Swiss-Prot record:
GN (gene name): Spsb4
Domain of life: Eukaryota
Subcellular location: Cytoplasm; Cytoplasm, Cytosol
Pathway: Protein modification; protein ubiquitination
Native species: Mus musculus (Mouse)
Name of the protein in question: SPRY domain-containing SOCS box protein 4
A molecular function (GO) term: ubiquitin-like ligase-substrate adaptor activity
Taxonomic placement: Eukaryota, Metazoa, Chordata, Craniata, Vertebrata
Pfam families: SOCS_box, SPRY
Length: 273
């Protein structure tokens, strides 16, 4: 799933986009996942109405980016030189477990493509090219090209992520990744190719955080799709039973639920219908 790329950080900036990471390199290395993450990902993805409610905020952005009229889940960046530009999502999260997908074509990332979360106070524009998300104490970001985590980056060095990377290695990423924000535990994590990469940031409890990215590539287009969320309260017993049955069947056999000797109402419940 993950592929290590050796070389200096400078070479990482200009490298050709890597092929889809080879999963064999991370076998046995997956860190412990948040307790309820599998439950969230087993749920049907949010519908379009919910996705639009959690989409990029056209009123909370750098002036050099705009949300597309024909695709409200996607923003486009104008080709402005010596500028780093960001945008926040509409909905901030202070509680619960949330996941959203970021689709950012590798060839449109350039030297500073950063994905993460931010408070409402974090800046969304900077002169020059920089890892804007994570540059101050109001945002937390993963630089996709350098494979570095930044928070208060003006005063602290970046940290390699995923954790198995060496100091001069980067991580070949596909076009899409999942962001996992657990405000009950106060953590931010990422999933690539179905592989949980471990906790990137801790200590986020007590804040209200919004999805955010910052970009430098002219004409880049980045799409955000909210996957789903779980409230902090314990799940009802029926939901836990459904999760247990679906886990026992496995993803490949979920299509067989319709043939089980069960009442139709229960079959429907198992299929989230």
């Amino acid at each position: 799933m993950g592929q290590k790329l050796s070389g200096s950080l400078k070479s990482v900036e200009v490298r050709e986009p890597a092929l889809r990471p080879a999963k064999r390199e991370l076998r046995g290395l997956e860190p412990g996942r948040p307790a309820r993450l599998d439950q969230l990902l087993d749920m049907p993805a949010a519908g379009l109405a919910v996705q639009l409610r959690h989409a990029w905020n056209p009123e909370d952005r750098s002036l050099n980016v705009f949300v597309k009229d024909d695709d409200r889940l996607t923003f486009h960046r104008h080709p402005v030189a010596q500028s780093t530009d960001g945008i926040r999502g509409k909905v901030g999260h202070a509680r619960g477990l949330h996941a959203w997908q970021i689709h950012w074509p590798a060839r449109q990332r350039g030297t500073h493509a950063v994905v993460g979360v931010a408070t409402a106070r974090a800046p969304l524009h900077s002169v020059g090219y920089t890892a804007l998300v994570g540059s101050d104490s109001e945002s937390w970001g993963w630089d996709l090209g350098r494979s570095r985590l930044y928070h208060d980056g003006k005063n602290r060095p970046g940290v390699a992520y995923p954790a198995f990377l060496g100091p001069d290695e980067a991580f070949a990423l596909p076009d899409s990744l999942l962001v996992v924000l657990d405000m009950d535990e106060g953590t931010l994590s990422f999933i690539v190719d179905g592989q949980y990469l471990g906790v990137a940031f801790r200590g986020l409890k007590g804040k209200k955080l919004y999805p955010v990215v910052s970009a430098v590539w002219g004409h880049c287009e980045v799409t955000m799709r909210y996957i789903n969320g779980l409230d902090p309260e314990p799940l009802p017993l029926m939901d836990l039973c459904r999760r247990s049955i679906r886990s026992a069947l496995g993803r490949q056999r979920l299509r067989d639920i319709g043939s089980l000797p069960l009442p139709q109402s229960l079959k429907n419940y198992l299929q989230y219908q």
